[in-house]
Regions:
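Gly/Pro-biased beta-strand-loop elements
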Residues: 116-228, 232-238
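Alpha-helical segment of the N-proximal tetratricopeptide repeat
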Residues: 32-61, 65, 296-299
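Alpha-helical linker/edge segments of TPR/alpha-solenoid repeat scaffolds
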Residues: 80-126, 339-343
Length: 367
């Protein structure tokens, strides 16, 4: 039966050969919990165990709920064809273009990998060091795995809520230029909610623009605009993993579910090439270390010892008014004019930015 798997899914057979599939819930002809990934997992398990009739029933049930799911249609066609003759390739339609079949194979692999390898409950993305109290949820995207994860702010600790298949840029991640068909990597926020009625059908059930380019992007000379989380056209259930012009694309059902977690102007959207995971203990240790550094900076500011305060800044520091020398001169003048300094930091958030640079994004309200 592994020969059939190779024919159905090509390289996916190697993934299945690594160990048995675990499919949650009782086996039934209904789609488990309305979850397309769970349903596909059940189909693949049936194929692995030579239960082709059961696999076909599950695909048929899946297509009742998701009639525009092209990958499911292709698997159904192969399962029907397998009744009459051996399969020699994934997608045995004479009319299907090779590039379209490759896209569907890539989607199948991405969905099954994500379904089989959910993050352990005692691990969290390294980036979510501290959400401010008003931020109820955070979004983390892994472009290599074609996956979006939702985490809840549980008294400061991120707790896994849900994850969804996504499409990203045709040419990958690390956007640098307008029109480069790449998805940006960094720390962003949802900036608006664009309802379906104001958009063309291409964007599906709606769109949520994000804050690309951010301050760091602009300092690095990156440009471009119009990076959104959005849905799919009405005649399409999902798109291949690498098919957008840079946006993060979800199925319409998944975007509708995601929308209930988004707070305009507040929800962080952290996009990575591949997520770094930390155990809860290691995450807590890294969080303490960074919060201690922030507290040292705050105390040194209050101390009016300008040299100690400036020691926290790189000589390459820049803001909208200039570089380090201008900043240092201004701080010395301001501090000399004060008899005391009181610094209170509210609504503190701390996010590690993915990517090659060791960059931490800290925001707060100063009182």
């Amino acid at each position: 039966m592994h020969q059939l798997l190779r024919a159905l899914l090509g390289g996916l057979a190697l993934l299945l050969a690594c160990g048995p599939l675990t499919v949650f819930g009782a086996e039934t002809s209904r789609v488990p919990g309305g979850d397309a990934d769970a349903a596909l997992g059940a189909v693949f398990k049936d194929i692995e165990q030579s239960r082709l009739g059961s696999a076909l029933e599950k695909v048929d049930a899946l297509l009742v709920g998701y009639p525009n799911f092209r990958l499911a249609h292709l698997i159904r066609g192969d399962l029907l064809l397998a009744r009459t003759r051996p399969l020699v390739s994934f997608g045995n339609s004479q009319d299907a273009p090779a590039d379209k079949l490759a896209d569907l194979r890539e989607e199948a692999i991405a969905r099954l990998k994500a379904y089989r390898n959910r993050p352990p409950s005692n691990y969290v993305p390294r980036y979510l060091l501290q959400m401010e109290p008003e931020q109820k949820y955070a979004i983390v995207v892994d472009t290599q795995r074609s996956r979006l994860y939702i985490y809840q702010n549980d008294n400061g600790r991120p707790r896994f809520v849900a994850d969804y298949y996504i499409t990203h840029g045709k040419l990958g991640a690390e956007k640098a230029r307008e029109g480069d068909k790449r998805t940006p990597v960094g720390v962003y926020h949802v900036t608006a909610n664009l309802p379906r009625q104001k958009l063309s059908d291409f964007y599906g059930s709606g769109a949520f623009p994000i804050s690309y380019p951010n301050e760091w992007d602009r300092q690095q000379g990156r440009d471009g605009h119009g990076i959104w989380l959005h849905g799919t056209p009405s005649d399409t259930y999902s798109r291949p993993p690498r098919a957008s012009d840079g946006c993060v694309v979800l199925t319409n059902r998944d975007l509708d579910a995601l929308s209930s977690y988004l707070q305009i102007g507040l929800t962080p959207v952290i996009i990575s090439n591949t997520i770094e995971w930390l155990s809860v203990d290691d995450w807590a240790s890294e969080r303490r270390s960074l919060n201690n550094q922030i507290e040292d900076w705050r105390k040194d500011w209050e101390s009016r010892d300008v040299d100690r305060y400036l020691a926290h800044y790189s000589k390459n520091f820049r803001n909208s008014e200039g570089g380090y020398e201008q900043w240092a001169r201004q701080k010395r003048l301001v501090t000399a004019s004060k008899n005391w300094v009181k610094v209170d930091l509210g609504k503190l958030s701390v996010f590690r930015s993915p990517g090659k640079q060791d960059l931490i994004v800290v925001t707060f309200e100063q009182d």
